[in-house]
């Protein structure tokens, strides 16, 4: 057995997590919180080992003195390895992963709507099988991204008529982007989210409301009821909906104009600016968006429930909950790392909780009281 190269360890708060790249990160069953034994085993599995070999390695490391010690180690090692296999982090061989490649590069992601390849120079190519007007989208490697996203072309879309269309990734032309045809609008979100990630911004799958001068995100998978809950706030006259499906969050760094920042951190690693929500025209099928920026108050992880109640979340669980709702690119470990770094930073300064809710107004009343208490206690 050997570890799947699409998995890696990421430090979140005081804990270590094993996370996959790609769409699997949206599934909690693919995420593992690692203890000391799991970290040791993960390190050993960087080369091919039989699980039975791990029993001996761990017995020697911990100095098993008798059969009882060996039995305990056997059970613990077996349980950790079973968890690795269950999540897909441990595989029979690298060859069994069947990584496909063509002239564009190694394939990282394949779905009905998009296929992503990694190029030899570290960039990416996105292909849209169902689109008529857009075929390939070419993204520069991170090293090619300059500091000022307003001054040069950042991505190219190739349509099937072989015409190269260059767009500027600029806050100045978001109004124009909103008028694009459907395929171009969807295609431009990919490079926009990629280069936003490079400067410390992530898209969260969520509906959002403006309440008490701050934006609050209700994050959940499609069909959970995030739009329904947001409409409760609007119906009761307490808030207005800012975006019905996708919200771009980051830190508001002064001095860079138009909301774009080179980085959310200074050279010592300290956070710069306060958490912020940036208006974009991407809003799923809701049709609701604003091209304005607001302070971010908090993120509520939404779950359907038979009764309304709020569950406090640890910092680490809050980060994992938000990370699972990120729709910014996480095609490889480098991009997962960027998502983790941004979200772990923002999560320090916002309210995070989990709301189990019904479709009744009582869910709105409960959440409003919770936010009021949070704000009044600051």
State where each predicted segment sits.
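Conserved lysine of the Walker
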Residues: 226
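Pre-Walker A adenine-sensing motif
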Residues: 194-211
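Long, charge-rich, low-complexity alpha-helical segments
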Residues: 30-112
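Short Lys/Arg-enriched alpha/beta "domain-start" segment
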Residues: 105-139
